[in-house]
């Protein structure tokens, strides 16, 4: 059936090329619809309890796009007229930005930050700073007011006065400019205020999203670099321009098909699936190399067997034979690769799901192009000249290694190789036990990256920028005014503050009530009212002097819901998880029997939810991939043993890579989660091609050792070049500067080394030990 298809195809090559080009141009048009989108929600697992709580908190109190602008003088304190004037100007400019959440801009110079104090007549609530203090006396009085209102001001100024910050939140991120423009607008505001001896650094979600956008855009240039790298390696493989250009053209067509479909269906590009073009380029070019390598073999064989035919007829027969013999294997390998990437949907994360599904379609698209365009274009091209065929056979740097392996196989000395790989697997298993998950800031950026500096400064000199929140939900309006509920909120806040973690500040509505009590009692201990009426009276007093909107970040309008916000000075995953667990357990104990529900979530707990989802998704993904490989190859080879043999080098490669990550301390994160699927999706080609070639040669010569040695010097050579091309292409990502891309580039390159080595070294040693019967079947 396949032979009839290929024969018909090469009979109408121009028609086939025209159809393929028409589809390519049509889908290429839709690439213009592609949009680069950076959405925080696409990186967190929907439906996870911690995420649900976080989304509820964001809806009630905001905080999703909170930004901290820190002022860090190199010497002295921030209590100078010059620095405070800068803080005031930046505060006013941020408050005027479109999309800013009303009343969310807080600083020492913000009218929203109040001074709660008493006078001879009554409790008074006035802005902390009506104007910038200019004289020494004014500055001293201002510092006293800041100290007296530390329940709030400690969020915005360090105890030693060496740093201060402005907090801002946005309720309409797109109106504010989105990731592309908002950071630039903030920079335009703070840049004129910078001077020698004063650092002004933005930090927060806006900063992270902007730099993700910067690093993501660099991938376009890296794609061109990867294209050049893969082209060079293909030229080394064939020593002809045809051998270099044809695989690249077909691979680029596959990329166009995949990106065009993404544009057609409206799938966004993000920092994770932006790497899809490089991946498809590598896989598509790899398949093409397998066909073309086999074409040169078949051309030499047909030319020797049928000297009576013309060179054009030799070319046509070679195209048919190469496509028929490689086609079925390519379809199997491509199907495995496509399903392997499609299985990434098991992670339940929108970004990884999009990456997997888009790559799966791209592989099928590349497969379609390779099974149509390559035979059609190859049959129209001039037959290889004697010089071209001779250059294609020229020894390259992989040949001595493969010849050595073939010699070891022929002489029956492969046992040490078998035991070396067994030992490597054992070491890898130990490393896997050390593997951890981490989706913190440090897992995505290098310490030297620009956005990290702002976070680290805020951590070391201020209250921090990362938060964990406890949502207190009442059964009815005014529930939060219940004195018992307020006491439990206070107790929970005290419990959290005492945890052995770098906690910068714990903020809740009780801080304001205790400060008012402290002022009214002339410096008393600050106690909470013991009745609903007492609480209501405090709040009435505040509304008379202040503004009820000042409370919007602490309680909702009906006093039915409140939030405790914990500011952290670390992004250590284990510390955050320990705090989340402890706070959840204590909240459950404290609020038992009260008409409220207390749940922990929001902020950095999204990273905890992401880690838990990834561990579960990774396990499911590995099981799915293993089953897919065994089922498909077992059906194709009509042997369960054959399916297990194909799985062996893939499992070895995935295991070694995960083990290395464990030993090297590289965590499982958003950037490295897809490594196993990529190891199988790309590496499946190697094992399938090799086993089919061993079977073909075994049926021809009847000697398993000779057949395996021949497969090593033929398919093994193609495998080596494909692996080197994929590795070279992905190593280009190391120039990105983005830790996720750098790690992925290195790990994929390592995957290519381990999967190809396991195929040409470990797999032959296993085949020769078990002598599977399916190799003898036609």
Regions inferred by a protein language model and the residue ranges of each:
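Signature of alpha-helical transmembrane segments and their immediate interfacial
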Residues: 1-38, 326, 376, 390-440
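Hydrophobic transmembrane alpha-helices and their membrane-interface caps
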Residues: 243-292, 642-692, 731, 758-762, ...
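Extracytoplasmic
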Residues: 85, 131-241, 252, 487-490, ...
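Membrane-proximal extracytoplasmic
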Residues: 1-231
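Solvent-exposed, non-transmembrane loop/terminal regulatory segments of multi-pass membrane proteins
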Residues: 16, 31-78, 84, 132-157, ...
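Interfacial segments of transmembrane alpha-helices in multi-pass membrane proteins
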Residues: 11, 213-269, 346-350, 620-665, ...
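Helix-loop junctions and hydrophobic alpha-helical segments within the transmembrane domains
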Residues: 298-335, 698-724
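Hydrophobic, glycine/alanine-rich multi-pass transmembrane helices and their short helix-loop junctions
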Residues: 331-373, 630-634, 656-667, 695-696, ...
């Amino acid at each position: 059936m396949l032979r009839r298809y290929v024969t018909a195809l090469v009979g109408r090559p121009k028609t086939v090329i025209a159809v393929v080009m028409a589809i390519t141009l049509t889908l290429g048009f839709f690439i213009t619809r592609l949009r680069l989108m950076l959405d925080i929600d696409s990186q967190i697992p929907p439906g996870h309890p911690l995420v649900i709580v976080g989304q509820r908190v964001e809806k009630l109190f905001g905080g999703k796009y909170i930004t901290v602008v820190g002022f860090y003088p190199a010497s002295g304190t921030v209590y100078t007229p010059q620095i405070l004037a800068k803080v005031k100007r930046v505060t006013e400019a941020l408050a005027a930005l479109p999309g800013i959440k009303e009343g969310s801009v807080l600083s020492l110079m913000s009218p929203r930050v109040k001074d709660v104090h008493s006078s001879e007549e009554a409790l008074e609530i006035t802005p902390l700073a009506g104007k910038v203090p200019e004289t020494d006396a004014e500055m001293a009085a201002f510092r006293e007011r800041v100290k007296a209102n530390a329940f709030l001001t400690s969020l915005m100024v360090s105890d030693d006065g060496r740093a201060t910050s402005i907090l801002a939140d946005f309720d309409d991120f797109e109106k504010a400019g989105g990731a592309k423009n908002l950071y630039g607008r903030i920079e335009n505001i703070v840049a004129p205020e910078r001077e020698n001896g004063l650092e002004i650094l933005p930090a927060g979600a806006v900063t992270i999203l902007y730099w993700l956008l910067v690093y993501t855009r660099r991938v376009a240039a890296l794609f061109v670099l990867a294209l050049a790298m893969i082209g060079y390696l293909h030229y080394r493989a064939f020593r002809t321009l045809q051998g270099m250009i044809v695989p690249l053209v077909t691979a680029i067509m596959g990329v166009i098909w995949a990106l065009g479909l993404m544009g057609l269906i409206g799938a966004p590009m993000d920092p994770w699936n932006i790497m899809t073009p490089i991946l498809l380029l590598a896989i598509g070019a790899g398949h093409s190399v397998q066909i073309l390598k086999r074409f040169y073999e078949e051309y030499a064989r047909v030319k020797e067997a049928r000297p009576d035919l013309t060179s054009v007829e030799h070319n046509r027969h070679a195209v048919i034979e190469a496509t028929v013999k490689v086609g079925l294997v390519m379809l199997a390998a491509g199907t495995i690769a496509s399903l392997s990437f499609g299985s990434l949907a098991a992670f339940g994360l929108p970004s990884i799901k999009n990456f997997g599904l888009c790559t799966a379609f791209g592989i099928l698209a590349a497969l379609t192009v390779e099974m149509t365009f390559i035979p059609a274009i190859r049959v129209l091209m001039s037959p290889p000249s004697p010089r071209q065929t001779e250059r294609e056979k020229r020894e390259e740097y992989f040949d001595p290694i493969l010849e050595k392996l073939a010699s070891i196989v022929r002489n029956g000395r492969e046992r040490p190789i078998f035991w070396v790989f067994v030992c490597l697997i054992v070491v890898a298993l130990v490393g896997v036990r050390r593997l951890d998950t981490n989706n913190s800031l440090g897992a995505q950026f290098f310490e030297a990256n620009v956005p990290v500096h702002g976070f680290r400064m805020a951590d070391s000199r201020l209250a921090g920028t990362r938060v964990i929140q406890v949502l207190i939900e009442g059964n009815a309006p005014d529930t939060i005014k219940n004195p018992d509920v307020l006491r439990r909120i206070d107790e929970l806040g005290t419990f959290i503050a005492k945890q052995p973690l770098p906690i910068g500040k714990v903020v809740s509505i009780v801080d304001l009530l205790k400060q008012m009590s402290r002022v009214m009692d002339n410096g008393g201990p600050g106690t909470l009212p013991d009745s609903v009426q007492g609480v209501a009276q405090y709040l009435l007093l505040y509304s008379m002097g202040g503004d009820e909107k000042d409370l919007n970040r602490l309680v909702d309008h009906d006093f039915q819901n409140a939030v405790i916000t914990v500011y952290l000075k670390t992004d250590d995953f284990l510390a955050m998880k320990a705090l989340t667990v402890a706070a959840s357990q204590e909240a459950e104990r404290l609020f038992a029997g009260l008409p409220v529900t207390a749940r922990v979530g929001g902020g950095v707990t999204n990273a905890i939810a992401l880690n838990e989802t990834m561990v579960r998704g990774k396990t499911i993904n590995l099981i799915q991939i293993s089953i897919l490989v065994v089922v498909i190859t077992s059906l194709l080879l009509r042997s369960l043993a054959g399916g297990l043999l194909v799985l062996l080098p893939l499992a070895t490669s995935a295991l070694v890579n995960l083990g290395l990550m464990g030993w090297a301390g590289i965590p499982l994160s958003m950037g490295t989660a897809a490594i196993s699927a990529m190891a199988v999706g790309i590496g499946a080609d190697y094992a399938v091609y090799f086993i089919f070639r061993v079977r073909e040669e075994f049926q021809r010569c009847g000697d398993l050792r000779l057949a395996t040695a021949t497969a090593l010097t033929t398919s093994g050579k193609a495998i080596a070049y494909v692996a080197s091309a994929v590795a070279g292409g992905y190593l280009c990502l190391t120039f990105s500067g983005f830790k996720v891309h750098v790690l992925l580039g290195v790990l994929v390159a390592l995957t290519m080394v381990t999967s190809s080595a396991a195929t040409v070294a470990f797999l032959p040693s296993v085949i020769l030990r078990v002598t599977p019967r399916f190799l003898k079947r036609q």
